[in-house]
Amino acid sequence: MSDPAVETAPVAVASPGKAKKEKKPKSDKPKKPKAPRTHPPVSEMVFNAVKTLKERGGSSLQAIKKFLIAQYKVDVDKLDTFIKKYLKSAVEKGQLLQTKGKGALGSFKLPAAAKKEKVVKKTEKKPKKAAAKPSKAGEKKVKKTIAKKPKAATATKIKKPVAKTTKKPAAAKPAAKKAAPKPKAAPKPKAAPKPKKAAAPKAKKPAAKPKAAKKPAAKKA
């Protein structure tokens, strides 16, 4: 008799490469702390450079780099690729206008739309300040007028009664003094000797002598 065939199931053998990948432990390496930025982003620096230079024909790449070195003290060689990328994207988005050249090579300036927006913002701020100022001035004027009116009223009210009371007694005193000497001057006409002189002609008796001349008439008898 023949032995029955024994069926053997296939055993999966793991490949050595896969086993190694799964068994590799993750090594926790200490992460280096990121150094703090000593300058703002490249996009901001380049935009400020074009904004402050304000060249009519536009600012060239070299002029922008010189500005970044002087203003932010950065290594322009390391940031060269970032500067060029920003210039290209800014021109595509309409943030900057390329006046000369192609790509990152050429001259760049702010578009007219950006300048108009800045002018509009400035003009909007000015009327607000001007509107606030007259209100303060109006408040001050109202306060001044209110403060002045009671002062003037009190001054006029006080002056009128003071003038009346002081003037009346002053006028009454000289009137009493003038009336006092008048009765003293009344006895002066009594002492006048002039009427006595007028009686002197009555004492002239020699004028009666012609009456004695009538005596011869008696002789006729």
Swiss-Prot record:
One of its GO terms (molecular function) is double-stranded DNA binding. GO terms for biological process: chromosome condensation; negative regulation of DNA recombination; nucleosome assembly. The keyword Nucleus applies. Residues 1-43, 113-221 are annotated as: Disordered. The keyword Nucleus applies. Signal peptide: none annotated. Pfam families: Linker_histone. PANTHER family: H15 DOMAIN-CONTAINING PROTEIN-RELATED (PTHR11467:SF20), HISTONE H1 (PTHR11467). Histones H1 are necessary for the condensation of nucleosome chains into higher-order structures. This is Histone H1C.
